[in-house]
C-alpha cells in the first residue's frame, strides 16, 4: 500500500478544535491556490473562500487555541530532548520555530480582521447567498476591479494574504507536528468495520487502496472511534470481507 498513486488519504478530526483547524487549513490553501484573480471564476472562488474563512474565524478563540497548542508542542519536544539518542539539534530547531511562531501570532492584529474590513470582500460577501448574484450588474465594483492592471490586483490580494501569514504559519507547524506524531500502521477491517481506542488523540489518518472504490464513514471522539467502510457505488459496489488499510491515530 506504499504506492501513493494507487491509494487515497483521508483525515478525520476527533474533536471540535481539530475540526476547525482542518477547515482553516483547507480554506487557506484554497486562497493561496486562487490568488491569481485574472478571471471572474477565480475571483469568485477566492472571495467565497475568504467569506468562509471569516465565518470560521468568528466561531471560536482561534488565536488562544493555537497559542496553547504551540506551548503544548514545545513541552512535548522538551520531553523528547531528554531521551538518549534523539537529535537534540533538530528538537531545539523545532522548539525555536514554535517560539517564533507564537511570538508573531501573539503580536499580530486580530486574526481575519483585514478580510472582514476589506470593502471588496464585504460587497461580494453580501451577494454570495443570492443565486447568480455576482453578475456584473449586481457587482459593478468587482467588474471594474477585475479590469484593473494585474499589478494593482496582486498588490491588493498579497496584502490580504500577508495579514493571514501569522495564522497560516502557526497552523502549518502545529498540524505538521501532529501528523508526524504517529506513523501509519497496517490494519484490517472485518466486514467493512473497524473500531479502537483513540487514547486522547486529535486526528485520525487513513490510507486506503483506490481499487475497491470505498470511503470511510467515521464516528468518534478523544477516547474511542469507529470506522465503517462503504462502497462509492451504493447500488453495485461491494466491500471486501477483509480490507487492508493503513491507520494513524495522531
From Swiss-Prot:
Q: Outline the subunit composition.
A: Interacts with FtsZ.
Q: Name one GO cellular component term.
A: cell division site
**A single GO BP annotation from the record?**
division septum assembly
Q: Which organism is it from?
A: Yersinia pestis
Explain the purpose of this protein.
Answer: Cell division factor that enhances FtsZ-ring assembly. Directly interacts with FtsZ and promotes bundling of FtsZ protofilaments, with a reduction in FtsZ GTPase activity.
This protein's UniProt keywords: Cell cycle, Cell division, Cytoplasm, Septation
Query: InterPro entries under this entry?
Result: ZapD, ZapD_C, ZapD_sf
Similarity comment: family membership: Belongs to the ZapD family.
In terms of PANTHER family, this protein maps to: CELL DIVISION PROTEIN ZAPD
Which classification does the entry list for the species? Bacteria, Pseudomonadati, Pseudomonadota, Gammaproteobacteria, Enterobacterales
Can you say what this protein is called? Cell division protein ZapD
Q: Which NCBIfam families match?
A: PRK05287.1-1, PRK05287.1-3
Entry superkingdom:
Bacteria
Indicate where this protein resides in the cell: Cytoplasm
Q: Which Pfam families match?
A: ZapD (PF07072)
Q: Where is coiled-coil annotated? A: none
Amino acid at each position: 500500500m506504499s504506492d501513493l498513486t494507487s491509494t487515497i488519504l483521508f483525515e478525520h478530526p476527533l474533536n471540535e478544535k481539530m475540526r476547525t483547524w482542518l477547515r482553516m487549513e483547507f480554506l487557506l490553501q484554497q486562497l493561496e491556490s486562487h490568488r491569481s484573480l485574472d478571471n471572474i471564476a477565480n475571483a469568485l472562488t477566492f472571495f467565497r473562500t475568504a467569506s468562509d474563512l471569516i465565518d470560521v474565524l468568528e466561531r471560536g478563540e482561534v488565536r488562544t487555541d493555537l497559542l496553547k497548542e504551540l506551548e503544548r508542542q514545545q513541552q512535548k519536544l522538551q520531553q523528547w530532548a531528554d531521551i538518549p539518542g534523539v537529535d537534540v539539534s533538530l528538537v531545539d530547531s523545532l522548539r525555536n520555530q514554535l517560539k517564533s511562531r507564537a511570538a508573531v501570532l501573539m503580536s499580530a492584529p486580530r486574526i481575519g480582521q483585514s478580510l472582514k474590513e476589506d470593502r471588496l470582500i464585504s460587497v461580494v460577501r453580501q451577494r454570495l447567498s443570492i443565486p447568480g448574484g455576482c453578475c456584473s450588474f449586481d457587482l459593478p465594483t468587482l467588474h471594474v476591479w477585475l479590469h484593473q492592471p494585474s499589478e494593482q490586483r496582486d498588490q491588493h490580494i498579497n496584502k490580504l494574504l500577508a495579514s493571514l501569514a501569522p495564522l497560516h504559519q502557526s497552523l502549518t507547524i502545529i498540524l505538521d507536528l501532529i501528523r508526524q506524531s504517529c506513523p501509519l500502521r497496517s490494519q484490517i477491517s472485518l466486514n467493512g468495520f473497524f473500531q479502537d481506542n483513540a487514547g486522547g488523540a486529535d486526528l485520525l489518518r487513513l490510507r486506503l487502496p483506490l481499487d475497491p472504490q470505498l470511503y470511510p464513514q467515521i464516528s468518534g471522539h478523544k477516547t474511542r472511534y469507529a470506522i465503517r467502510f462503504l462502497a462509492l457505488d451504493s447500488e453495485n459496489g461491494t466491500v471486501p470481507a477483509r480490507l487492508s488499510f493503513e491507520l494513524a491515530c495522531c
